[in-house]
Amino acid sequence: MTVPYEFMMAVHLFLHTDNYQPHELKAAVAQRSEWIERIQRQFDEVLQTRPVTVDWYAEHANEGFDDEETLYRYLNEVYDYVFRDGPWPVTEG
């Protein structure tokens, strides 16, 4: 299964350990651009279909998780923080 492109770019731009800024993505959400809407749709798709593996995430975000359950708990926390006004993500890799 392929990881959607816009989701991959959001990981590189906002969630990579060298540039960890989910608050910047959250700020961009307020502008509701077409790009942000694509990211949200693709983030929804990733959470539903679960194509991101621990190895993929480690390669693209430079962050390791022990298992996919922990990874997807973290991704759900990021989604809630960015798109639903949830708290800052607390799950760590």
Residue ranges and their predicted role:
Residues 10-15, 42, 60, 72-75:
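Aromatic-residue detector
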Residues 60-93:
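Amphipathic alpha-helical binding modules
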Residues 15-57:
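Amphipathic alpha-helical interaction modules
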Residues 1-27, 79, 86:
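Short terminal alpha-helical segments
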Residues 2, 34, 38, 66-73:
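Alpha-helix boundary/N-cap detector
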